[in-house]
Design a protein with these regions (language model features):
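Helix N-cap/capping motif at the beta->alpha junctions
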Residues: 31-40, 61
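Hydrophobic/aromatic residues positioned on beta-strands within the core alpha/beta folds
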Residues: 76-78
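Receiver (REC) domain switch/output surface
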Residues: 108-119
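Active-site residues of response regulator receiver
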Residues: 53
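Charged docking surfaces used in two-component/phosphorelay signaling
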Residues: 16-24
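Receiver (REC) domain active-site loop signature in two-component systems and cognate sites
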Residues: 56
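Conserved sequence signature across two-component system core domains
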Residues: 7-9, 32, 50
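Alpha4 helix (beta4-alpha4-beta5 surface) of REC/receiver domains from two-component response regulators
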Residues: 62-63, 80-99, 106, 110
Length: 119
């Protein structure tokens, strides 16, 4: 069964690039452009993984992750993992990975596969 990934990023180029990369690798990808759009999409679909930008407009990321407890989340950010930890964003057990932008395409695909137990 095809896994579904929700990509949430306010940067259209990043959002669409990640979508294309993942679709080419066999995933069903849904996108959201900010925190509010993310929460709206989650009412419509339950993805297997959310790739979530840490810094974007709309509902703050800390509020989003409080509402999502049963879906794996991997952060995408230009900030360092230590900065995310300082903000308390890595405390939930469903936070499974952290991708620092810019990221390597093959690394992204490999790590998503590992997260979804496909590699």
């Amino acid at each position: 069964m095809t896994k579904t990934i929700l990509v949430v990023d306010d940067e259209p180029d990043i959002r669409e690039s990640v979508k294309l990369i993942l679709e080419v690798n066999g995933y069903n990808v849904i996108t959201a452009n900010d925190g509010d759009d993310c929460l709206k999409k989650l009412k419509e679909v339950k993805p297997n993984l959310i790739l979530l930008d840490i810094m974007m407009p709309g509902t703050p990321v800390d509020e989003i992750i409080k509402q999502i407890t049963n879906i794996k989340i991997a952060f995408m950010s230009v900030v360092r993992i230590s900065d995310a930890r300082k903000k308390g964003l890595c405390m939930q057990e469903n936070i499974v990975d952290f991708f620092q932008k810019p990221f390597n395409v093959s690394d992204l695909v490999d790590r998503v596969g590992l997260i979804l137990n496909e590699k």
